[in-house]
């Protein structure tokens, strides 16, 4: 119990940080501890999933405590760092004009641990229903019905091209804003997808934000070409050693899929929504024409 916006448990005061956009779960912080509070069934499922991730050695927080609270359920977990890499990279860019070598190295180290743990979940069963649902393809078709035929044709192309890849447990929103100095947070968007989807889109997701002012959000940092090359080659090595095709061979497919995901359910940010609708149409057409999407997004939406 406690003041509005605060909870006190075992003498520790937790202050409200945020409430998830698409789930009735509130997040509180006390020092280096985080508390999540919400419906019991939802959080018990989340805790069980969290423990599964730990079994696969994903770099994620440890759960210290759980229980009933004010008619709901809660659990407390350790912190993985004070700032996510989105914040760190923005500060680097403001202060030094780009992402620092040391911070990029830390980011890469966590991403490598994640990639290796994720491959331990590989499954030859292709759960295409989970992939379809996880990307929000149904929402995309509802919001952009005039593009339905081309969108479904493009998704069929993705499925065909990625047949050589096993499916893995996928974060769904793997990007610098969900990666901290000691691990990864917020698996709330997880689903099953072809191996490499998270890995490639991690460094291309920033292009789903406009660089200019006048929007609810904007892109405030970018990776250098050398950093992109270093990151992608590290990931390619991990996949080669696992006997799998290189993720970069599927960059077009994964960037297109991440664009589907980023385009939907943006009602609360209408300026970004319109910008992403226009952008999706361009990327969809380019993907169906077999154009290079890494080159396109960097040319059209990069610096």
Labelled PLM ranges:
Residues 2, 122-172:
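An alpha-helical support segment within catalytic cores of ATP-dependent transferases
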Residues 18, 24-30, 156-197:
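Active-site acidic catalytic loop and adjacent metal/ATP-binding pocket
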Residues 18-47:
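ATP-binding glycine-rich loop module of kinase domains
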Residues 62-73:
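Short beta-strand micro-motifs within the conserved protein kinase catalytic domain, predominantly
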Residues 71-84:
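Conserved short submotifs of the Hanks-type protein kinase catalytic core
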Residues 83-130, 152, 158-162:
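Conserved kinase catalytic-core helix
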Residues 199-243, 255-276:
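Active-site activation/catalytic loop segments of kinase-like enzymes and analogous catalytic loops
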Residues 257-303:
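ATP/Mg2+ or Mg2+-diphosphate-binding catalytic cores
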